């Protein structure tokens, strides 16, 4: 078998990586929640009757409301709160670090929260920066939300802009 990467210099100590368990760890679930594995859910809260698809990661401190649907390959980071009756489509990404230091901060005190209201639908591969989105909003596929959304409507583009009020 061939090894990839550089060989360790003779006498160099073997490094052991920090291993974190994957799966479902310290999650608070509401009633009738469905989770399709594999997933990586930890220290988060999932509301009643919510569906979590495969290959989803929901990080500590995130809160998902009731009757939500989180589709496969979505990433929901720390400090995200999602209201009730929301739909998060495949590959949607939530970001809490604005890179104010020029690169990844890695410091939670520099991260910012994201809050979605009720009945918000996020399209496939949309990126949501730390913003607040009001109730009854549709975000189109591939959109990048960089500013707060305070008017119910359909938004799309990069940066996302209002196409039509609801």
Residue spans for each PLM region:
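Acidic, glycine-centered active-site loop in nucleotide-sugar glycosyltransferases
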Residues: 151, 156-159
